[in-house]
UniProtKB/Swiss-Prot annotation:
UniProt cross-references to PANTHER family, sorted A to Z: 4-HYDROXY-2-OXOGLUTARATE ALDOLASE, MITOCHONDRIAL, DIHYDRODIPICOLINATE SYNTHASE
UniProt organism field: Pseudomonas syringae pv. syringae (strain B728a)
Key words of the record: Amino-acid biosynthesis, Cytoplasm, Diaminopimelate biosynthesis, Lyase, Lysine biosynthesis, Schiff base
GO biological process, one term: diaminopimelate biosynthetic process
Protein name: 4-hydroxy-tetrahydrodipicolinate synthase
Main localization (coarse): cytoplasm
Subcellular location: Cytoplasm
Disulfide bonds: none
Length: 292
């Protein structure tokens, strides 16, 4: 079972937007040393929308090779074309990923039946564990609990990243699926409470810059130690909030640059963090113990 703190890894780039393989290697080592339980590569935070197919495969391949089986590697392979999602998922399997994360189709706004058929088709086409990903704030497509329940019985579909931040939604999903279906948080601000309800981990933006704290939080929440988990959560809350002061992954890439872990690169149409946001984020990093 893949569980715990799963970092939604950034994809390092130089100032011209070229992929920085040395920094990627440095980040993977950072997470292996700091107790991250799994790495999610080329997801939303990894700027999958602006990577070409060859870059997408190469990031997965390099992360898988460096991790060398020590922790699971989950590859983002979602697309708003079912055919493309099958291709990306096949590529990820061939590159050695342990599982795939598939966001709901964005922009074309399928019906619930369309979502069921989309994910079922991918699951039947590629034999690899697959995690659904619901984030309607970014996709304009909301997969309802009834659809999740239907999909939870499909072979190869093993869980969902629920990123609405709505704990009632998480409760509804948990109540409608079997106990072996994995429900993960995709919202750092509410992750601790979702895990205390029975969720199996957090696919986290904050873990990029505070991996040890997020690992400890997830471990405490999953063993039912609410007091410890909530105490860590309170310390991380300034960071959880400020890492979304502009669109993700703009702030988290700036924070990692501030920590000396990667250059100042991001791809258009995203732009580097505006100067007015620098000090609020720097202060949140200090409050959360990331900077001294």
């Amino acid at each position: 079972m893949i569980a715990g703190s799963m970092v939604a890894l950034v994809t390092p780039m130089d100032a011209q937007g070229r992929l920085d393989w040395d920094s990627l290697s440095k980040l993977v080592d950072f997470h292996l040393q700091e107790g991250t339980h799994a790495i999610v590569a080329v997801g939303t935070t990894g700027e999958s929308a602006t990577l070409d197919v060859n870059e997408h495969i190469e990031v997965i391949r390099r992360v898988v090779t460096q991790v060398a089986g020590r922790i699971p590697v989950i590859a983002g392979t979602g697309a708003n074309s079912t055919r493309e999602a099958v291709e990306l998922t096949t590529n990820a399997k061939n590159a050695g990923a342990d599982a795939c994360l598939l966001v709901t189709p964005y922009y074309n706004k399928p019906t619930q039946e369309g979502l069921f058929q989309h994910f079922s088709h991918i699951a039947n086409a590629v034999d690899i564990p697959q995690i659904l990903y619901n984030v309607p704030g970014r996709t304009a497509c909301d997969m309802l609990p009834e659809t999740v329940a239907r999909l939870s019985t499909v072979k190869n579909i093993v869980g969902i990243k629920e990123a609405t931040g709505n704990l009632q939604r998480a409760k509804d999903i948990l109540a409608s699926v079997s106990s072996d279906f994995l429900v993960y948080s995709g919202d750092d601000a509410t992750a601790v409470e979702l895990m205390l309800l029975g969720g199996k981990g957090n696919i986290s933006v904050t873990a990029n810059v505070a991996p040890r704290a997020m690992s400890d939080l997830c471990a405490a929440a999953m063993r039912g130690d609410a007091q410890t988990a909530r105490a860590i959560h309170e310390k991380l809350m300034p960071l959880n909030n400020t890492l979304f002061i502009e669109s993700n992954p703009i702030p988290v890439k700036w924070a990692l640059h501030e920590m000396g872990l990667m250059p100042d690169g991001i791809r258009l149409p995203l732009t580097w963090l505006s100067e007015a946001c620098h000090e609020p984020l720097r202060q949140a990093m200090r409050q959360s113990g990331v900077l001294v």
